Design a protein with these regions (language model features):
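Conserved nucleotide-sensing/catalytic segment adjacent to the nucleotide-binding pocket
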Residues: 1-34, 50
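Glycine-rich phosphate/ribose-binding loops and adjacent secondary-structure elements
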Residues: 8, 40-45
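Short gly/ser/thr-rich secondary-structure transition/capping motifs
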Residues: 31-39, 122-125
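Extended, charge-rich C-terminal regions with high alpha-helical propensity
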Residues: 33, 43-44, 133
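Short loop/turn elements that form and flank the Walker-type P-loop nucleotide-binding site
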Residues: 45-47, 69-70
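Structural recognition of the conserved hydrophobic beta-strand(s) that form the central parallel beta-sheet
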Residues: 50-54, 75-76
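Short beta->alpha connector loops
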Residues: 56-59
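Conserved NTP phosphate-binding and transfer environment spanning the P-loop NTPase/kinase superfamily
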Residues: 61-209
Length: 209
């Protein structure tokens, strides 16, 4: 969650190479082994192409201070839930983000729900330290929350939450989330477009990640 864990020098080098029309060998990070890997994925952009870079440190000037300002356009993306259970009880945006993360971590990082829940306080602190202070530097803000996402996530996250042992400290939070999900009727993912933002978490997307 900290920018110190990133290879900023390599990132800067690659971005400048792309902006100069050169081809780069794109590395990927294996969250299970904790190592950088190369799988032959090459990238080159044309003169009129747009390079999209996504990440929690995207608004932090330290990440791109070697990139020309006129080559950057900053977008702040956040899942801000607009749904209320009733006139007095709103659905916290943080619950939606946690459910997203539980599903994604299970599918791509080899973490079970208990482990993701146990790290959630640290993630929230990381948001306070590394994301929220830089919101004001964004050129535009985009709300990534989808009206149907909790109904779709339900089928993925319920089995994961049910797998949290009663003996673990995370059991109480798992039960709270399960009770919260009872308010939603689950739906399948057949009608979720392959280019939907939700595909980042449930898989089946059309973009290379």
């Amino acid at each position: 969650e900290t920018i110190a864990s990133l290879d900023v020098d390599l990132l800067t080098k690659h971005i400048n190479q792309l902006l100069d029309g050169e081809e780069i060998d794109v590395p990927s990070y294996n969250f299970i082994t904790g190592k950088r890997e190369y799988h032959g994925h090459k990238l080159k952009i044309g003169q009129k192409d747009v390079l999209v870079m996504e990440g929690i440190h995207g608004l932090n000037g330290t990440l791109t201070n070697e990139i020309p300002e006129d080559a950057k356009y900053r977008i702040y993306v956040s899942a801000l839930n607009q749904i209320n259970l009733d006139e007095h009880n709103r659905i916290p945006s943080s619950d939606g983000r946690l459910l997203r993360r539980i599903v994604r971590d299970a599918m791509t990082r080899g973490n079970d729900a208990r482990e993701t829940i146990s790290r959630w306080d640290s993630v929230r602190k990381g948001e306070e330290d590394n994301i929220f202070p830089y919101q004001e530097y964004a050129d535009v803000m985009f709300n990534s929350s989808l009206i149907y996402e909790l109904a779709v996530l339900k089928q993925y996250v319920e089995p994961l939450l049910l797998g949290v042992s009663k003996d673990s400290p995370e059991y109480v939070e798992a039960k709270r989330l399960l009770k919260f999900l009872d308010y939603f009727v689950g739906i399948g993912n057949d009608n979720v477009p392959t280019n939907s933002l939700l595909r980042e978490f449930i898989g089946g997307g059309c973009f290379h990640v």
